[in-house]
């Protein structure tokens, strides 16, 4: 997910009202959050989001504006919040970081080759939009940030990259064919294959634990007016993300199936370790669309259950490799209103 969308979603969320009291024995957990225990806050201050586990479950990689930075850079830390290190270049804007399963390298997207400065913010005169920066390319590096290598070199937007658990493929989002679609490629950037081709935004892919399926978010305009609006925004490297649904497909792009159908902003889907359920973020229960919470749903669209009840923002969930812990980003317990921080919790079925 792009940093601009993170900021916009959080800005909407902090306007929500009606805080519930936390559970007395677990001060960061609300009483209704029965699947979460022992919630711990790992970051403090600024915008911190999209934290993902290393293959051994001992580290997290995430994006942050800490240290007074104007736009996100990539950091790693231990799962107790210690040993925070910046591993990107410190230039441009970065997003969508992920560990290789063997822990030997990381991947992330960056605009630093296009410009060392932060790219301009999107034009909000066009409404609720976020930027698809064409300067984004995908890179890999050692976990300490050294040995930086460029993976994609195609003109346009290449970002939202994730490594398959078997370590063989990268799924990512690109505008290389004049639309926002999901592709796969080998770890070295070769053998690129387009998986989606319906007009509209297909992005934010994540793999199932067996590397056989991909879950993603999508918005496919239906009417000619909607299509024209989408294409006009895309021409200006913008997208309007107010309606996103969760989809799944096989790793080769076949078997596409829509999972949610609520007309809201559903994003950041991630498979449960059992491969039968998906956890994701949505504003479906807030008529004003400001409050984002975590939900689980079966891959066939049944069994919807709300997981978090924080009245501002909870998003970007990911399970640890053993399925025992959940990491997510939240505004709960923010010292400065609107600050987004990283939290980790024990998962309880």
Residue ranges and their predicted role:
Residues 44-47, 64-74, 89-94, 109-138, ...:
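A flexible loop/linker signature enriched in serine peptidases of the S9 family
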């Amino acid at each position: 997910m792009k940093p601009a969308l993170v900021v916009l979603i959080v800005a909407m969320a902090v306007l929500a009202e009606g805080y519930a009291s936390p559970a007395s024995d677990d001060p960061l957990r609300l009483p209704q959050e029965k699947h979460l225990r022992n919630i711990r806050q790992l970051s403090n201050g600024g915008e911190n989001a999209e934290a993902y586990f290393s293959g051994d479950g001992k580290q997290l990689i995430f994006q942050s504006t800490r240290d007074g930075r104007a736009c996100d850079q990539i950091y790693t830390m231990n799962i107790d919040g210690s040993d925070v290190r910046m591993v990107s270049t410190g230039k441009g804007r970065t997003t969508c970081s992920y560990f290789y399963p063997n822990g030997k390298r990381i991947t992330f997207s960056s605009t630093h080759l296009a410009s060392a400065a932060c790219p301009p913010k999107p034009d909000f005169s066009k409404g609720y939009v976020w930027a698809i920066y064409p300067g984004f390319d995908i890179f890999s590096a050692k976990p300490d940030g050294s040995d930086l290598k460029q993976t994609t070199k195609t003109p346009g937007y290449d970002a939202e990259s994730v490594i398959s658990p078997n370590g063989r493929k990268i799924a990512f989002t690109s505008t290389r064919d004049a639309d926002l679609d999901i592709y796969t490629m080998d770890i070295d950037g070769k053998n690129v294959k387009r998986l989606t081709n319906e007009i509209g935004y297909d992005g934010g892919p994540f793999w199932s634990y067996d590397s056989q399926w991909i879950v993603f978010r999508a918005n496919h305009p239906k009417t000619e007016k909607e299509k024209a609006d989408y294409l006009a925004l895309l021409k200006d490297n913008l997208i309007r993300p107010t309606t996103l649904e969760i989809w799944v497909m096989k790793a080769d792009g076949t078997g596409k199936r829509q999972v949610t159908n609520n007309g809201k902003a559903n994003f950041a889907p991630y498979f449960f370790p059992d491969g039968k359920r998906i956890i994701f973020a949505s504003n479906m229960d807030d008529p004003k669309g400001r409050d984002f919470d975590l939900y689980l749903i079966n891959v066939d669209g049944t069994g919807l259950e709300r997981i978090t009840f924080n009245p501002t923002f909870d998003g970007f969930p990911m399970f640890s490799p053993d399925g025992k812990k959940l990491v997510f980003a939240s505004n709960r317990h923010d010292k400065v209103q609107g600050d987004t921080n990283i939290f980790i919790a024990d998962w309880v079925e």
